[in-house]
Amino acid sequence: MQASIESTGNLERRLTFTLPQERLETHVGGRLRELARTTRIKGFRPGKVPTKVIEQRFGQQVRAEAMEGLLRETFDSAVREHSLRLAGNPRIDQGETDFDFVATFEVVPDFGDIDVTKLSVVRATAEVTDADIDQMIENLRLQRRTWNPVERGAQVGDLVALETWSQAGDERLPAEGVETGSSVLGSGVMFDQIEKGLEGLTKGEEKTLTVDFPAEWRVPQLAGKTVQVHVKAVEVSEPVLPAVDKEFIKSFGVKSGDAEQFRADIRTNLERELKGALMNRLRREVGEQLIAAYAHVEMPPRLVENEARSMLAQQVEQVRRSGRDPGQVPADAHQGFMDAAAKRVLVGLLVGEVARRNELRLESKRVSETLRLIASTYEEPEQVIEMYRNDPQLMNGLQSRVMEEQVIDWIAERAQHTEQSLSFQDAIRV
């Protein structure tokens, strides 16, 4: 195989290579003969379709597929021959002839000695208590609460139905009429100054509040201004929580309505949530230590930029889902994510290097356990497991996640570590 490599930057390489034309023609010919034996075409007996007819009908597709497969195979072979470790996907361009190609890509930087025993890691621990289960049951009661209108003044926990309008200088919002809505006091849904101003209001009572909106407030006409907000309490209602009886318990999928089974199910769910939260804490802790120890290592620029653009895309999607216009996000906004992206790339490459150097292998048992854990959150867990097993993309994502967790655990076990005991609530507050 003809292949040459050159450095075009600290971490960028250019590989020029030529596809073996004979192998391509052999593969194409073999595939066409196979199609001639198996393809049914009107006017010809099975297995008797002339190769020329097959080539006219399928030749272009077969050649394109063969070229793509051979291109990847030849590139991978050249990469192995030159002992290159790629960081990200290559860009492959056509060369001077149909069989010449030029691949441009970035390589993993040299991290030198990776001694994880020098890292200092704080490993959080926590457990689910009966008090945590009691709190979750109370939260479930709040989810199923009903509302009873009252004549007294509004207090924290009450639902207040509102009519509002604002005066910002000479501008009235809305220009005519009022805006209607409702809010549970203490929920933090409304701006804090407005929410506190509603406390004590009775049904039908009106009030004018002076509110200082921050510069980044979501309504441009109010952002950074001191505004007169006129509010009217249309109705004040207090919450009525359901009793924890059999019907209540059955509504959460416990068919027997048994209180002990209900608590056992809640414990299982909370322990699953806690396990994920503790791993996220450990992932962040190990990541921060790796960043501090290897921040001096240059990262592949294109890989970092791609990560920054991916982070921006996630933010744009969040903006869209919130009902705001994603078009307001500047085209170069990814620049603001470059530092965070560089850290993500650094940790990702280091985790990969630790796995490679220490010959860590994906544990199939851990993959199965994680899959069962994910599936257990759905009503039909077996269907979820089957869906993952039949979807290579989903399964690859799961395996990558499990492999990362294995490496994080491996690093934490060998680093200098101290344990930090947390309550359940503190532990899940990541």
UniProtKB/Swiss-Prot annotation:
All residue ranges annotated as the PPIase FKBP-type domain in the record: 157-242
Any one GO molecular-function label of the UniProt entry: peptidyl-prolyl cis-trans isomerase activity
Keywords, in A-Z order: Cell cycle, Cell division, Chaperone, Cytoplasm, Isomerase, Rotamase
Catalytic activity: [protein]-peptidylproline (omega=180) = [protein]-peptidylproline (omega=0)
Cellular compartments annotated: Cytoplasm
GO biological process, one term: 'de novo' cotranslational protein folding
Primary localization class, coarse: cytoplasm
EC number: 5.2.1.8
Recorded GO CC terms: cytoplasm
Domain of life, source organism: Bacteria
TM region positions: none
SUPFAM superfamilies reported for this sequence: FKBP-like, Triger factor/SurA peptide-binding domain-like, Trigger factor ribosome-binding domain
Domain notes: Consists of 3 domains; the N-terminus binds the ribosome, the middle domain has PPIase activity, while the C-terminus has intrinsic chaperone activity on its own.
UniProt xrefs under HAMAP family: Trigger_factor_Tig
Functional description taken from the UniProt entry: Involved in protein export. Acts as a chaperone by maintaining the newly synthesized protein in an open conformation. Functions as a peptidyl-prolyl cis-trans isomerase.
Family to which the UniProt record says this protein belongs: Belongs to the FKBP-type PPIase family. Tig subfamily.
Protein name: Trigger factor
Species: Xanthomonas euvesicatoria pv. vesicatoria (strain 85-10)
